[in-house]
């Protein structure tokens, strides 16, 4: 997979090189989907403030700096540092960072919150993405991570076993949906459709209950794609289908089959098959296509925004169109500050606002916005923008049409993102100027809906029944935590050292 050029990759370093073991990223971490921005002055200030807090509070709590930063109190300290830099966006107090008992009690209170992560990934066993192996070898040689020194490295951190640890043991996630991505090169699919449903079966069997859902990927225009839908429906029995209108997001230079959601001749036959099979949820990758990428691949630009969503939603009211990344355009090649400034001047966030306006403009109720990657990117780089994006989606789509996704494991264990949304509130000045309503408490109706109730409804999952029947995975997590299990605070990808 070669999404970044050799020249771009040469100036980046592995995210695991980051010496600062922060509970939340203090710089943007990118997969090869986009070129990450350099650490901003504000992010450097957050890092410095958190470092000082750790140096002060860890000795008082009788723990190492590393242990502190992996604790609930350390997580609170990270959001405290962010508030000091960006303003009061996150609900946290210095007392929570200073008192591990208080922090742990809050964590226990929220631990049973139902969280359905509708946007997760891991890589197949025979993946060719060797860049991540080289990254981990370099980490070991540099001595940054003692666990990697003098040990041959593999991609296990991006594969099944570590996925289970980071998603189900190191976070409050209760249910997840495993996704994939297609390619013109068959071996460069993240997971094939049979691999994806095999992972679902493996986790559910180990758990003794329903913990995992699975996509099947559909690829309009590729040879045999309709036959593959038929095969997947009959043999794999996926919970939903996912498509990439960009065609091949992995090898954009090879993408020969981009498509539009509202293409009657090419794509509507797939919707007919989905509807006939009772598969109502159509997940679509949109956005993450900044101007820098557009300059490289201008021919793909007509396929990556959300201009094709409304017509398809209107033509297919029996289906739900879940737009991944909520169409957010600027993951790199345009700064979050620029996006925030544009919003403050125009009231718009490119492509997110377009998505949020679809229900009012077109009278549809079957369009959903997914927070995967978009929340992670903006929360760590410009949390006011994260608040704006969530606020716009809630205002336009309705809080019952916004769904949680983390894009783990690329972003590491998703607990920092979960805590970010739990604590996030839209600042008073944005509420007054733009009419946003408060998001409310961590376990209030808006956030409970986003975190899990909406996806549970979409996928027919009974939350009450789940809560009443602890399974083997619940017991495994309890044993893991009792034995002192902790988050790694690792992320997998590239950072810009500038």
Residue map of PLM features:
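Active-site gating loops and adjacent loop-to-helix segments of metal-dependent hydrolytic enzymes
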Residues: 38, 126-158, 290-295, 364-368, ...
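Active-site gating/metal-coordination segments in enzymes
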Residues: 182-304
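Catalytic pocket-lining loop regions of alpha/beta-barrel enzymes
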Residues: 248, 255-404, 412, 429-440, ...
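Mid-to-C-terminal alpha-helical segments outside catalytic/metal-binding sites
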Residues: 62-83, 101-105, 114, 130, ...
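Divalent metal-dependent hydrolysis catalytic cores, especially in the metallo-beta-lactamase
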Residues: 118, 133-156, 165-188, 211-217, ...
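C-terminal segment of N-terminal export signals and the immediately downstream linker at the start
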Residues: 3, 55-63, 83-120
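Acidic (Asp/Glu)-rich catalytic clusters
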Residues: 164-172, 193-210, 229-238, 272-277, ...
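N-terminal secretory signal peptides
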Residues: 1-63
């Amino acid at each position: 997979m070669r999404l970044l050029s050799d020249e771009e990759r040469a100036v980046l370093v592995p995210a695991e090189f980051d010496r600062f073991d922060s509970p939340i990223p203090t710089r943007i971490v990118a997969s090869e989907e986009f070129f990450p921005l350099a650490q901003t002055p504000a992010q450097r200030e957050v890092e410095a403030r958190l470092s000082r807090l750790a140096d002060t509070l860890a000795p008082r709590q009788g723990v190492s700096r590393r242990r502190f930063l992996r604790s609930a109190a350390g997580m609170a300290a990270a959001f405290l540092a962010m508030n000091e830099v960006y303003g009061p966006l996150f609900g946290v107090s210095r007392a929570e960072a200073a008192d591990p008992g208080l922090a742990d009690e809050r964590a226990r209170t929220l631990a049973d919150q139902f969280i359905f992560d509708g946007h997760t990934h891991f890589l197949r066993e025979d993946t060719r993405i060797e860049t991540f192996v080289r990254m981990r070898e370099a980490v070991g040689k540099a001595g940054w991570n003692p666990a990697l020194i003098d040990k041959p490295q593999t991609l296990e951190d991006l594969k099944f076993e570590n996925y289970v640890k980071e998603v189900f043991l190191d976070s409050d996630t209760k249910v997840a949906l495993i996704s994939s991505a297609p390619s013109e090169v068959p071996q460069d699919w993240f997971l094939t459709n049979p691999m994806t449903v095999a992972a679902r079966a493996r986790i559910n069997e180990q758990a003794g209950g329903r913990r995992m859902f699975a996509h099947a990927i559909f690829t309009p225009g590729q040879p045999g794609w309709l036959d593959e839908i038929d095969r997947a429906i009959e043999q794999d029995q996926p919970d939903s289908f996912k498509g990439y209108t960009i065609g091949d997001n992995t090898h954009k230079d090879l993408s020969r089959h981009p498509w539009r959601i509202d293409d009657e001749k090419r794509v509507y036959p797939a919707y007919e098959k989905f509807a006939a099979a009772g598969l109502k949820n159509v997940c679509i990758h949109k956005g993450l296509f900044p101007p820098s990428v557009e300059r490289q691949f201008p021919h793909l630009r007509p396929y990556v925004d959300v201009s094709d969503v409304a017509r398809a939603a209107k033509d297919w009211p029996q289906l739900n169109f879940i737009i991944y990344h909520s169409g957010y355009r600027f993951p790199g090649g345009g700064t979050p500050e620029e996006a925030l400034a544009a919003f403050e001047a125009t009231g718009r966030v490119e492509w997110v606002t377009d998505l949020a306006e679809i229900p009012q403009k077109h009278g549809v109720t079957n369009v959903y916005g997914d927070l995967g990657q978009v929340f992670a990117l903006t929360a760590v780089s410009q949390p006011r923008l994260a608040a704006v994006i969530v606020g716009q989606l809630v205002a336009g789509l309705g809080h019952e049409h916004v769904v949680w996704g983390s894009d783990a494991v690329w972003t590491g264990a998703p607990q920092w993102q979960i805590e970010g949304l739990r604590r996030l509130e839209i600042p008073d000045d944005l509420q007054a100027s733009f009419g946003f309503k408060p998001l409310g408490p961590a376990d209030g109706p808006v956030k409970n809906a986003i975190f899990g109730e909406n996806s549970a409804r979409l996928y027919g999952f009974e939350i009450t029944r789940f809560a009443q029947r602890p399974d083997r995975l619940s017991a495994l997590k309890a044993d893991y935590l009792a034995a002192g299990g902790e988050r790694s605070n690792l992320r997998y990808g590239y950072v810009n050292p500038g």
